[in-house]
Swiss-Prot record:
<feature type="binding site">
    <location>
        <position position="155"/>
    </location>
    <ligand>
        <name>Zn(2+) 1</name>
    </ligand>
</feature>
<feature type="domain" description="J">
    <location>
        <begin position="5"/>
        <end position="70"/>
    </location>
</feature>
<feature type="binding site">
    <location>
        <position position="172"/>
    </location>
    <ligand>
        <name>Zn(2+) 2</name>
    </ligand>
</feature>
<dbReference type="GO" id="GO:0009408">
    <property type="term" value="P:response to heat"/>
</dbReference>
<dbReference type="InterPro" id="IPR012724">
    <property type="entry name" value="DnaJ"/>
</dbReference>
<feature type="repeat" description="CXXCXGXG motif">
    <location>
        <begin position="152"/>
        <end position="159"/>
    </location>
</feature>
<comment type="similarity">
    <text>Belongs to the DnaJ family.</text>
</comment>
<keyword id="KW-0346">Stress response</keyword>
<feature type="repeat" description="CXXCXGXG motif">
    <location>
        <begin position="205"/>
        <end position="212"/>
    </location>
</feature>
<dbReference type="GO" id="GO:0051085">
    <property type="term" value="P:chaperone cofactor-dependent protein refolding"/>
</dbReference>
<feature type="repeat" description="CXXCXGXG motif">
    <location>
        <begin position="191"/>
        <end position="198"/>
    </location>
</feature>
<keyword id="KW-0963">Cytoplasm</keyword>
<dbReference type="InterPro" id="IPR008971">
    <property type="entry name" value="HSP40/DnaJ_pept-bd"/>
</dbReference>
<dbReference type="GO" id="GO:0031072">
    <property type="term" value="F:heat shock protein binding"/>
</dbReference>
<feature type="binding site">
    <location>
        <position position="191"/>
    </location>
    <ligand>
        <name>Zn(2+) 2</name>
    </ligand>
</feature>
<dbReference type="GO" id="GO:0005524">
    <property type="term" value="F:ATP binding"/>
</dbReference>
<keyword id="KW-0677">Repeat</keyword>
Length: 380
């Protein structure tokens, strides 16, 4: 029997986003999961079909091959295939993490059911940091203060008020999970009384309210690498929220935001700046000082430089955090028009303008070209 189109299997269009594909798969997996349909061969086949479609369309390379060649591009039994297909349910828990763990009683890393309290990885934390362009370019070491959980000094981490005890949950008898019948099938879910801990605290600690920990602040050392760009994140492993029931802690992600600079604009590893010069320097040329992140450099402006001209200073940008190569600095020329002139200065400019126009296109090539275009426009 010919295979159905993977997009048709998931019920999405060929232009569906990764998020839409994932949502469609989750919906079908929930509907046809074997735990919900224990005696249905049809449901099992539909589940496998949906899983195979998701494995192909969620992988960029496999999806590209399928879009171009169809099933021939990904079938291991055909030339050019990627060699992937639906084989059992091994990738199911990995694809969904703990989303189905609470529904079907599966631990976060496998399908063991009814085996006591589950361990969960702690949540990741995000810390937003604003730095200057100079700090981003050169890198530096700094300290940040982030929320942190400490052991409660009142109950010493037990969660129970001193003098009382922690008891085995009377609902799940320490298993952390209970069986619930819904219609024609039975599911395992997290115990609603102990929330999967398997323990029950009749008299919670008055300070930490049964958590066994209290929130505080922790100082961390953070190394900002040279060349870091807007929106990049630095991971500090193990400094997120603590795990549950002995699970590993999450990570802390420091998200970098760069302040606007008064002189430079950044474009990747390149820098841009506007450089005002006088009319005289633009006409006759001359040396000017150009600012860079490493200090001032001397640049020779060629004579006859026009407004809007851009000069490129190689290697005067930012050394990329990934590439290791320095970008360039682009200097955009802005010719300043003199203001608040004296009468003597005005007269000198009139004489200069007259002498320039007597030379025609020899002195003002752009103006002469524009005048020629206007004449042609009105004479046509």
């Amino acid at each position: 029997m010919a295979k159905r189109d993977y997009y048709e299997v998931l019920g999405v269009g060929k232009n569906a986003s990764d998020d839409e594909i994932k949502k469609a798969y989750r919906k079908l997996a929930m509907k046809y999961h074997p735990d919900r349909n224990p005696d249905s061969k049809e449901a099992e086949e539909k589940f496998k079909e949906a899983k195979e479609a998701y494995e192909m369309l969620s992988d960029a390379d496999k999806k590209a091959a399928y879009d171009q060649y169809g099933h021939a591009g990904v079938d291991p039994n055909m030339a050019g295939g990627f060699g992937a297909g639906a084989q059992g349910f091994g990738g199911f828990a990995e694809a969904f993490g703990d989303i189905f763990g609470d529904i079907f009683g599966q631990a976060q890393q496998g399908g063991r059911r009814g085996a006591g309290p589950q361990m969960y990885r702690g949540a990741d934390l995000r810390y937003s940091m604003e730095i200057t362009l100079e700090q981003a370019a050169h890198g530096y070491d700094t300290q940040i203060r982030v929320p942190h959980w400490d052991e409660c000094d009142h109950c010493h981490g037990k969660g129970a008020e001193p003098g009382s005890s922690v008891e085995t949950c009377p609902t799940c008898h320490g298993a952390g999970q209970v069986r619930v019948s819904q219609g024609f099938f039975t599911m395992q879910q997290t115990c609603p009384k102990c929330h999967g801990n398997g323990k029950y605290i009749p008299k919670p600690c008055s300070k930490c309210h049964g958590q066994g920990k209290v929130k505080s602040q922790k100082t961390l050392e953070v190394k900002i690498p040279a060349g870091i760009d807007e929106g990049m994140r630095i991971r500090s492993s193990g400094n997120g929220e603590p795990g549950i029931n002995g699970g590993p802690p999450g990570d802390l992600y420091v998200e970098i935001h760069i302040k606007a600079h008064s002189v430079f604009e950044r474009d990747g590893d390149d820098l841009h700046c506007q450089m005002p010069i006088s009319f005289a320097v633009a006409a006759m040329g001359g040396d000017i000082e150009v600012p860079t992140l490493g200090g001032r450099v001397t640049f020779n402006v060629p004579e006859g430089t026009q407004a809007g001209k851009t000069f490129r200073l190689r290697g005067k940008g930012i050394k990329g955090v990934r590439s290791g190569y320095a970008g360039d600095l682009y200097v955009h020329v802005v010719i300043e028009t003199p203001v608040r002139l004296t009468e003597h200065q005005r007269e000198l400019l009139r004489q200069f303008d007259k002498s320039v126009h007597e030379g025609g296109s020899r002195h003002s090539p752009q103006e002469q070209s524009w005048l020629d275009k206007v004449k042609n426009f009105f004479s046509s």
